[in-house]
Protein backbone atom coordinates (compact mmCIF):
# COMPACT_ATOMS: atom_id res chain seq x y z
CA UNK A 1 0.00 0.00 0.00
CA UNK A 2 2.82 2.37 0.97
CA UNK A 3 4.66 1.60 -2.29
CA UNK A 4 1.54 2.41 -4.30
CA UNK A 5 1.16 5.67 -2.37
CA UNK A 6 4.80 6.61 -3.06
CA UNK A 7 4.45 5.74 -6.73
CA UNK A 8 1.36 7.93 -6.89
CA UNK A 9 3.24 10.86 -5.35
CA UNK A 10 6.17 10.42 -7.74
CA UNK A 11 3.80 10.25 -10.71
CA UNK A 12 2.06 13.44 -9.57
CA UNK A 13 5.37 15.30 -9.12
CA UNK A 14 6.64 14.21 -12.53
CA UNK A 15 3.36 15.22 -14.15
CA UNK A 16 3.51 18.68 -12.57
CA UNK A 17 7.15 19.12 -13.63
CA UNK A 18 6.40 18.10 -17.21
CA UNK A 19 3.46 20.48 -17.34
CA UNK A 20 5.63 23.30 -16.01
CA UNK A 21 8.32 22.55 -18.59
CA UNK A 22 5.70 22.48 -21.32
CA UNK A 23 4.29 25.83 -20.24
CA UNK A 24 7.80 27.26 -20.07
CA UNK A 25 8.64 26.03 -23.56
CA UNK A 26 5.34 27.34 -24.88
CA UNK A 27 6.04 30.69 -23.27
CA UNK A 28 9.43 30.84 -24.93
CA UNK A 29 7.97 29.99 -28.32
CA UNK A 30 5.37 32.74 -28.10
CA UNK A 31 7.81 35.36 -26.89
CA UNK A 32 6.36 35.68 -23.40
CA UNK A 33 9.67 36.31 -21.59
CA UNK A 34 10.50 39.74 -20.22
CA UNK A 35 13.57 40.43 -22.36
CA UNK A 36 13.73 41.45 -26.01
CA UNK A 37 17.09 40.63 -27.57
CA UNK A 38 18.21 42.64 -30.60
CA UNK A 39 21.06 41.22 -32.67
CA UNK A 40 23.21 43.58 -34.74
CA UNK A 41 25.53 43.04 -37.70
CA UNK A 42 29.24 43.86 -37.22
CA UNK A 43 28.71 47.13 -39.12
CA UNK A 44 26.38 48.41 -36.41
CA UNK A 45 28.14 46.82 -33.41
CA UNK A 46 30.85 49.46 -32.94
CA UNK A 47 31.14 51.67 -29.85
CA UNK A 48 30.55 54.76 -31.99
CA UNK A 49 26.96 53.60 -32.63
CA UNK A 50 26.08 52.75 -29.02
CA UNK A 51 23.98 55.90 -28.61
CA UNK A 52 21.87 55.00 -31.64
CA UNK A 53 21.44 51.38 -30.55
CA UNK A 54 20.44 52.44 -27.05
CA UNK A 55 17.96 55.01 -28.37
CA UNK A 56 16.21 52.33 -30.42
CA UNK A 57 16.30 49.93 -27.48
CA UNK A 58 14.79 52.56 -25.17
CA UNK A 59 11.89 53.12 -27.57
CA UNK A 60 11.20 49.38 -27.79
CA UNK A 61 11.45 48.98 -24.01
CA UNK A 62 8.98 51.80 -23.44
CA UNK A 63 6.53 50.39 -26.00
CA UNK A 64 6.61 46.80 -24.73
CA UNK A 65 7.36 47.27 -21.04
CA UNK A 66 10.21 44.80 -21.38
CA UNK A 67 13.96 44.97 -20.93
CA UNK A 68 15.99 45.23 -24.13
CA UNK A 69 19.38 43.57 -24.54
CA UNK A 70 21.75 44.24 -27.44
CA UNK A 71 23.54 41.27 -28.98
CA UNK A 72 26.65 42.59 -30.75
CA UNK A 73 28.51 40.47 -33.30
CA UNK A 74 31.73 40.34 -35.28
CA UNK A 75 30.44 38.10 -38.08
CA UNK A 76 27.46 38.19 -40.44
CA UNK A 77 26.90 34.44 -40.15
CA UNK A 78 26.68 34.63 -36.36
CA UNK A 79 24.07 37.39 -36.53
CA UNK A 80 21.98 35.44 -39.03
CA UNK A 81 22.24 32.20 -37.04
CA UNK A 82 21.24 34.02 -33.86
CA UNK A 83 17.91 35.22 -35.24
CA UNK A 84 17.28 31.97 -37.16
CA UNK A 85 17.85 29.77 -34.10
CA UNK A 86 15.40 31.71 -31.88
CA UNK A 87 18.23 33.25 -29.84
CA UNK A 88 17.14 36.79 -30.69
CA UNK A 89 13.77 38.46 -31.09
CA UNK A 90 14.74 41.28 -33.45
CA UNK A 91 17.59 41.90 -35.89
CA UNK A 92 18.77 44.75 -38.08
CA UNK A 93 20.12 43.17 -41.24
CA UNK A 94 20.54 43.73 -44.95
CA UNK A 95 18.02 42.48 -47.47
CA UNK A 96 20.20 39.48 -48.38
CA UNK A 97 20.64 38.53 -44.73
CA UNK A 98 16.88 38.72 -44.23
CA UNK A 99 16.30 36.53 -47.29
CA UNK A 100 18.80 33.93 -46.05
CA UNK A 101 17.29 33.98 -42.56
CA UNK A 102 13.69 33.65 -43.74
CA UNK A 103 14.67 30.81 -46.08
CA UNK A 104 15.97 28.92 -43.04
CA UNK A 105 13.12 29.86 -40.69
CA UNK A 106 9.76 31.01 -41.97
CA UNK A 107 9.08 32.69 -38.61
CA UNK A 108 11.42 35.51 -39.67
CA UNK A 109 9.35 38.47 -40.85
CA UNK A 110 10.22 42.09 -41.72
CA UNK A 111 9.05 44.83 -39.37
CA UNK A 112 10.07 48.11 -41.00
CA UNK A 113 12.66 49.75 -43.22
CA UNK A 114 13.89 53.32 -43.18
CA UNK A 115 12.57 55.48 -46.00
CA UNK A 116 14.31 57.94 -48.24
CA UNK A 117 13.89 61.74 -47.99
CA UNK A 118 10.31 61.47 -49.32
CA UNK A 119 9.18 59.56 -46.24
CA UNK A 120 8.04 56.67 -48.45
CA UNK A 121 9.41 53.43 -49.88
CA UNK A 122 9.82 55.09 -53.30
CA UNK A 123 13.35 56.27 -52.47
CA UNK A 124 14.19 53.85 -49.66
CA UNK A 125 17.66 53.03 -50.86
CA UNK A 126 21.35 53.35 -50.14
CA UNK A 127 24.34 52.71 -52.42
CA UNK A 128 26.78 49.91 -53.12
CA UNK A 129 30.23 51.20 -54.01
CA UNK A 130 33.27 49.82 -55.77
CA UNK A 131 36.20 51.95 -54.69
CA UNK A 132 39.88 52.29 -55.56
CA UNK A 133 42.69 54.34 -54.11
CA UNK A 134 42.96 57.79 -55.70
CA UNK A 135 46.54 57.24 -56.78
CA UNK A 136 45.56 54.02 -58.57
CA UNK A 137 42.58 55.39 -60.49
CA UNK A 138 44.25 55.30 -63.91
CA UNK A 139 44.80 51.55 -63.54
CA UNK A 140 41.02 51.10 -63.60
CA UNK A 141 40.18 53.32 -66.55
CA UNK A 142 39.87 52.65 -70.27
CA UNK A 143 39.95 55.72 -72.51
CA UNK A 144 39.65 57.93 -69.45
CA UNK A 145 36.53 56.22 -68.04
CA UNK A 146 36.26 53.65 -65.27
CA UNK A 147 35.73 50.17 -66.69
CA UNK A 148 34.92 46.86 -65.02
CA UNK A 149 37.24 45.23 -67.58
CA UNK A 150 40.12 46.33 -65.36
CA UNK A 151 38.98 44.20 -62.40
CA UNK A 152 40.54 41.05 -63.81
CA UNK A 153 43.58 39.79 -61.85
CA UNK A 154 43.14 42.37 -59.08
CA UNK A 155 43.06 41.84 -55.32
CA UNK A 156 39.39 42.33 -54.45
CA UNK A 157 37.71 42.86 -51.06
CA UNK A 158 34.07 42.02 -50.38
CA UNK A 159 32.25 42.42 -47.06
CA UNK A 160 30.64 38.99 -46.54
CA UNK A 161 28.88 36.65 -48.92
CA UNK A 162 25.72 37.40 -46.89
CA UNK A 163 26.05 41.14 -47.52
CA UNK A 164 23.59 42.71 -49.95
CA UNK A 165 25.61 45.76 -51.01
CA UNK A 166 28.97 44.26 -50.08
CA UNK A 167 28.61 41.09 -52.14
CA UNK A 168 25.29 40.18 -53.80
CA UNK A 169 24.82 43.42 -55.75
CA UNK A 170 28.45 43.93 -56.87
CA UNK A 171 28.93 40.25 -57.69
CA UNK A 172 25.78 40.31 -59.85
CA UNK A 173 27.12 43.35 -61.69
CA UNK A 174 30.55 41.77 -62.18
CA UNK A 175 29.15 38.40 -63.32
CA UNK A 176 26.93 40.20 -65.82
CA UNK A 177 29.84 42.22 -67.16
CA UNK A 178 32.03 39.13 -67.63
CA UNK A 179 29.18 37.06 -69.09
CA UNK A 180 31.50 35.29 -71.55
CA UNK A 181 33.40 33.74 -68.62
CA UNK A 182 30.29 31.97 -67.22
CA UNK A 183 31.23 32.98 -63.70
CA UNK A 184 29.24 32.08 -60.58
CA UNK A 185 29.10 33.75 -57.17
CA UNK A 186 31.35 30.99 -55.87
CA UNK A 187 33.96 31.89 -58.50
CA UNK A 188 34.16 35.39 -57.02
CA UNK A 189 34.75 34.11 -53.50
CA UNK A 190 38.28 32.92 -54.21
CA UNK A 191 41.28 33.88 -56.24
CA UNK A 192 41.72 32.32 -59.67
CA UNK A 193 38.61 32.47 -61.86
CA UNK A 194 38.64 36.29 -62.07
CA UNK A 195 40.51 37.94 -59.22
CA UNK A 196 44.08 37.21 -58.19
CA UNK A 197 43.04 37.27 -54.52
CA UNK A 198 39.75 37.67 -52.67
CA UNK A 199 39.39 39.11 -49.17
CA UNK A 200 36.34 39.45 -46.93
CA UNK A 201 36.38 42.41 -44.57
CA UNK A 202 33.71 40.98 -42.26
CA UNK A 203 32.01 44.38 -42.24
CA UNK A 204 31.70 47.30 -44.64
CA UNK A 205 34.19 49.19 -42.53
CA UNK A 206 36.59 46.26 -42.68
CA UNK A 207 36.32 46.00 -46.46
CA UNK A 208 37.04 49.71 -46.86
CA UNK A 209 40.08 49.44 -44.60
CA UNK A 210 41.33 46.50 -46.68
CA UNK A 211 41.51 48.94 -49.58
CA UNK A 212 43.06 51.81 -47.66
CA UNK A 213 45.78 49.74 -45.96
CA UNK A 214 46.77 48.30 -49.36
CA UNK A 215 45.56 44.76 -48.69
CA UNK A 216 43.24 45.07 -51.71
CA UNK A 217 43.23 46.96 -55.01
CA UNK A 218 39.44 47.30 -55.18
CA UNK A 219 36.83 47.07 -52.44
CA UNK A 220 33.06 46.75 -52.28
CA UNK A 221 31.25 48.49 -49.43
CA UNK A 222 28.26 50.80 -48.94
CA UNK A 223 27.81 54.50 -48.33
CA UNK A 224 25.60 54.31 -45.24
CA UNK A 225 28.02 52.10 -43.29
CA UNK A 226 31.02 54.39 -43.75
CA UNK A 227 29.35 57.81 -43.71
CA UNK A 228 30.29 58.31 -40.06
CA UNK A 229 33.99 57.96 -40.88
CA UNK A 230 34.48 59.71 -44.23
CA UNK A 231 33.67 63.00 -45.97
CA UNK A 232 33.50 64.09 -49.59
CA UNK A 233 36.81 65.63 -50.59
CA UNK A 234 36.02 66.17 -54.27
CA UNK A 235 32.85 65.83 -56.35
CA UNK A 236 29.34 64.96 -55.17
CA UNK A 237 28.04 62.18 -52.93
CA UNK A 238 27.43 58.82 -54.56
CA UNK A 239 28.86 59.85 -57.92
CA UNK A 240 31.40 57.91 -59.96
CA UNK A 241 34.72 59.76 -59.83
CA UNK A 242 34.04 61.43 -56.49
CA UNK A 243 36.80 61.34 -53.89
CA UNK A 244 36.20 60.58 -50.21
CA UNK A 245 38.63 61.24 -47.38
CA UNK A 246 38.78 59.49 -44.00
CA UNK A 247 38.13 62.01 -41.22
CA UNK A 248 41.01 62.91 -38.92
CA UNK A 249 38.99 61.85 -35.85
CA UNK A 250 37.53 58.69 -37.40
CA UNK A 251 36.74 55.89 -34.96
CA UNK A 252 37.97 52.30 -35.25
CA UNK A 253 38.81 50.68 -37.59
CA UNK A 254 39.44 53.85 -39.64
CA UNK A 255 41.66 55.36 -36.94
CA UNK A 256 44.59 53.55 -38.56
CA UNK A 257 44.02 55.13 -42.00
CA UNK A 258 42.96 58.70 -41.18
CA UNK A 259 43.49 61.14 -44.04
CA UNK A 260 43.48 58.36 -46.64
CA UNK A 261 41.45 58.93 -49.79
CA UNK A 262 39.54 56.68 -52.18
CA UNK A 263 37.61 57.21 -55.40
CA UNK A 264 34.32 55.67 -56.50
CA UNK A 265 34.52 53.63 -59.71
CA UNK A 266 30.97 52.24 -59.48
CA UNK A 267 27.79 53.30 -57.64
CA UNK A 268 24.64 51.12 -57.54
CA UNK A 269 21.37 51.83 -55.66
CA UNK A 270 20.28 49.12 -53.19
CA UNK A 271 17.05 48.56 -51.23
CA UNK A 272 17.26 49.74 -47.62
CA UNK A 273 17.93 47.26 -44.82
CA UNK A 274 15.05 46.01 -42.65
CA UNK A 275 14.52 45.44 -38.97
CA UNK A 276 13.13 41.90 -38.77
CA UNK A 277 11.51 39.74 -36.11
CA UNK A 278 11.54 36.08 -35.20
CA UNK A 279 7.82 35.61 -34.59
CA UNK A 280 8.34 32.40 -32.61
CA UNK A 281 10.65 34.19 -30.20
CA UNK A 282 8.92 37.57 -30.13
CA UNK A 283 5.20 36.87 -30.44
CA UNK A 284 2.51 38.78 -32.33
CA UNK A 285 1.63 41.21 -29.53
CA UNK A 286 5.17 42.53 -29.13
CA UNK A 287 5.65 42.53 -32.91
CA UNK A 288 2.65 44.84 -33.29
CA UNK A 289 3.85 47.14 -30.49
CA UNK A 290 7.36 47.34 -31.94
CA UNK A 291 6.14 48.00 -35.47
CA UNK A 292 3.88 50.75 -34.16
CA UNK A 293 6.63 52.52 -32.22
CA UNK A 294 9.08 52.23 -35.13
CA UNK A 295 6.55 53.90 -37.44
CA UNK A 296 5.75 56.66 -34.94
CA UNK A 297 6.60 60.35 -35.26
CA UNK A 298 8.43 60.07 -31.94
CA UNK A 299 10.90 57.63 -33.46
CA UNK A 300 11.20 59.64 -36.68
CA UNK A 301 11.98 62.81 -34.71
CA UNK A 302 14.52 61.21 -32.37
CA UNK A 303 17.84 62.80 -33.34
CA UNK A 304 19.82 59.97 -31.75
CA UNK A 305 18.21 57.64 -34.30
CA UNK A 306 17.76 59.90 -37.33
CA UNK A 307 20.76 62.19 -37.03
CA UNK A 308 20.37 65.60 -38.74
CA UNK A 309 22.53 65.70 -41.86
CA UNK A 310 24.42 68.78 -40.59
CA UNK A 311 25.32 67.06 -37.30
CA UNK A 312 28.76 65.69 -36.48
CA UNK A 313 27.24 62.91 -34.38
CA UNK A 314 27.48 59.29 -35.47
CA UNK A 315 24.23 57.53 -36.21
CA UNK A 316 22.55 54.65 -37.97
CA UNK A 317 20.27 56.85 -40.06
CA UNK A 318 20.45 60.42 -41.32
CA UNK A 319 17.70 63.02 -41.61
CA UNK A 320 17.64 65.39 -44.55
CA UNK A 321 13.87 65.74 -45.02
CA UNK A 322 11.05 63.29 -44.17
CA UNK A 323 13.04 60.14 -43.39
CA UNK A 324 11.30 57.72 -41.03
CA UNK A 325 10.50 54.02 -40.58
CA UNK A 326 7.58 52.42 -42.43
CA UNK A 327 6.18 48.88 -42.35
CA UNK A 328 7.24 46.64 -45.22
CA UNK A 329 6.14 43.31 -46.67
CA UNK A 330 8.31 40.38 -47.73
CA UNK A 331 7.55 40.96 -51.42
CA UNK A 332 9.37 44.30 -51.33
CA UNK A 333 12.68 42.41 -51.20
CA UNK A 334 12.03 40.36 -54.35
CA UNK A 335 14.48 42.37 -56.51
CA UNK A 336 17.33 41.33 -54.19
CA UNK A 337 15.96 37.79 -54.00
CA UNK A 338 16.05 37.59 -57.79
CA UNK A 339 19.66 38.82 -57.90
CA UNK A 340 20.82 36.10 -55.52
CA UNK A 341 18.99 33.44 -57.56
CA UNK A 342 20.60 34.40 -60.87
What are these regions (language model features)?
Residues 42, 72-76, 87-99, 103-107, ...:
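Beta->alpha turn/N-cap motifs
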Residues 34-36, 40, 44-55, 277, ...:
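An extracytoplasmic/periplasmic, membrane-proximal ligand-sensing/linker region
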Amino acid sequence: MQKKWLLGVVFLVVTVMLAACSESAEGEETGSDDVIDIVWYPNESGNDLKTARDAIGDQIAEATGKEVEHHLTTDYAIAIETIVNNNADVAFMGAQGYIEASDQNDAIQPIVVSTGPSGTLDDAMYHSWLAVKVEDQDDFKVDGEFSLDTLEDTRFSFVSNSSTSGFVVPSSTIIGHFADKDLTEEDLMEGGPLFSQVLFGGSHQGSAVNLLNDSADVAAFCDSCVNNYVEVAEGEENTVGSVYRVKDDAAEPFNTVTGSEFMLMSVTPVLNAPFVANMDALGQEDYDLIQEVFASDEMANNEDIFVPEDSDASGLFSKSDQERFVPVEDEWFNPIRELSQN
